[in-house]
Amino acid sequence: MKLHNVLKNNNKEDVVSNIEQFGGNADWFNAARVLSESLPYIQQFSGETFIIKYGGAAMKDRKLAENFAHDIVLLKQLGINPIVVHGGGSKINEFLEKINKKSTFVNGLRVTDAETLEIVEMVLCGLVNKDITQLINKAGGNAIGLCGKDANLIEAKKVCYTYKENQSNNVEKILDMGFVGEPHEVNTDLLFFMEESDFIPVIAPVCSGENDLTYNVNADLVAGALANALAAAKLIILTNVPGVTDVNGNLLSEISVSNAESLIEQGIANAGMIPKLQTCIKVVKEGYGSAHIIDGRIPHVLLLELFTIHGTGTMVLNTDI
């Protein structure tokens, strides 16, 4: 029996079995099939800009970090323009513990005093950012490490929260978050230049604001601001969980803006998931592209999400589901 006769068989399992009889490997067949199936997605996304927020387990696990770097280089080679925005909360915690300093979080944001800000800037801009750029360059890319301060890339404004100390009255108090900011303005010139080049921007979320003050800005918020400013086709946020879950803990593969807002209001989405959902909501409301929250613990999760029919995590949509 000739191999070309085997390939006429419409049963995929039989084809794989018979290929092995001819000295082949089922993994080869599956790899070729996946490459073939990815063609429509590659054609669709070529020339588009993707904002990818990188953090969590994908950053802490060295093998996952190397996989991520290779995937970013592959996207660039396929004609896609990836822009990486990274966090680094666990590494910041590690350094704060060395000086016996604890952090307080409000709605997923770290209250940042002057001492904490020094640690944040040192860790994000000096350690984490350079490690990511090195991994991408080692994988064959041309990554450039930046932060929001560089070329006035991202200007921030101070964040303040209001809250009611006593629910029985309407008196609101202001919580000073310290040097915590939110994106106010994005200078797109540098990033548009990089879109036309071989460079891959890797951005740390440390930004400047009024009176030359430095602000610690949540990486999810920075990623969202860049997605809106650049009219990116996709915002993809890697995290430590499978995606957004409902009140019973079930994964939601798709969620509307209104349902996402309800999860926040009801306290079902909490802690670090709040800025992630808020960012996705804002991006899809602008109508520029789609927003995804995916599980960074899965090897090559970016490729699975983008180039196969087996999407992962949660997609936030500006429609009712």
Curated annotation (Swiss-Prot):
Its EC number is 2.7.2.8. GO terms for biological process: arginine biosynthetic process via ornithine; L-arginine biosynthetic process. Keywords: Amino-acid biosynthesis, Arginine biosynthesis, ATP-binding, Cytoplasm, Kinase, Nucleotide-binding, Transferase. The record marks K53, K276 as: Transition state stabilizer. Catalyzes the ATP-dependent phosphorylation of N-acetyl-L-glutamate. Belongs to the acetylglutamate kinase family. ArgB subfamily. This is Acetylglutamate kinase.
